[in-house]
Amino acid sequence: MQLTLSDIEKAWASKDPALVDYIITLASQPDPVPDKPIRSEALTFQKFLNTIFSPSFLAKPTEEQQAWRVEQIRLLEAEDAELPLAERLKLHKIILLLWTDKSLYARHVLLEVITKIPLVYGPWRALKHIFKAAEASNDYPLLGALAARCDMAIKPEFSRATLLYMRRRAWRYLRQLGQTLPVVYPEAASHFLAAYTDDTHWQQTWIAKHIFYHETHAYGSAQFGYISPKTNLLDKRAFKEAWQRSPEPLLRLLSMARAEPIRKFACDALKTDFAVILRDVEVQWLIDLAHLPVRSTVIDNFIVWLLQNSPKLEQQQFRKLGLHTIVIGLLESQDSEALNYAIHYVKAQARDLPVSELLRLALKPNADLAKLVRQLISERDPRRELGLEAWGQLLALPNY
């Protein structure tokens, strides 16, 4: 069954948990087949697209192009149009309503839609408008989400020239912010960076590369040249001194980031620029960091660095401070340094791990972890603490 704009409006009115999914589905929905053949002279959206991308049309003055586009869209959207627009092409109405509604619910839905919706006609009409409005109002989270979507896009339905313009405009905004208000640049840039995902083609980005590598000057008017992976992005990042003012934007970025390279940037900058300040790290913040809903080797490594960097955090106090379970959790880390730290902690401070925990860890393929488990199991009473069932499970595993 095909979704309609009316279905979306009803879902919004009832605060349906699936509202975002409905919007994404409608944006990707194929246009319905007309009941009767279309007249060759009839105005259609596809004809409109064919015209605006034709060389002859693009050769006309900009003002003439704009006037023609506005008039044709008016005719296509008219109630008496011979061929009504497909429902997906009307999605801009819903997205703009989400933007004008200032409730927290609408804001949450809008940001999720921006993150997931395909960059196609219909939604794009609203997103472009919101981009400009967010820029004018200095709405960093909204502008950052839209800018990152444009920077990550590979093949949008609209013209690549439009996409490149939006990328350049977004970086120009950040650059001017860094030049005129450097104190707020890291906060704004953090919201931009937080919106990138792990499937980003980093070598093809424009905004992210400027944030990371602006001082390499290895860029032209529309794209960067090759940046070696060995390049120190902390030395070549834009507005380096602004980032070094306070750790707060980087700490927030670490909790917001959706991509591992962004987390690494934040952690590396914190280690390099704020090692002294972080010697007095708040225990609760460290606990909150460990409980972020993401598996990250970068964060695991950073947690170990924080524990080792702070003289007030002694391993004997970890249970009392609430850090014991965090370090035990690092036994499952994919980061070798974090895993090694956790293994040594267990040997020194936690040889009393429950048998159920040891049996669960025994399923992990890591050789160093298997050695630890064997060592701890050998210290337990084979009948009273382990039992036949546990021995049966262990003997079925290759490392035991």
Say what each PLM segment does:
Residues 1-243, 254-263, 269-276, 290-297, ...:
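Extended amphipathic alpha-helical repeat scaffolds
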Residues 186-190, 244-253, 276-288, 312-329, ...:
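Amphipathic alpha-helical scaffolding segments comprising HEAT/armadillo-like alpha-solenoid repeats
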Residues 233-234, 239-241, 316, 341, ...:
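Short leucine-rich amphipathic alpha-helices used at interfaces
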Residues 266-267, 300-304, 342-343, 373-374:
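Hydrophobic core positions within HEAT/HEAT-like alpha-solenoid repeats
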Residues 268-273, 284-285, 347-349, 364:
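Amphipathic alpha-helical scaffolding segments
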Residues 271, 304-308, 347, 378:
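Structural signature of alpha-helical solenoid repeat scaffolds
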Residues 326-327, 398-400:
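Amphipathic alpha-helical segments within extended alpha-helical solenoids and repeat-rich scaffolds
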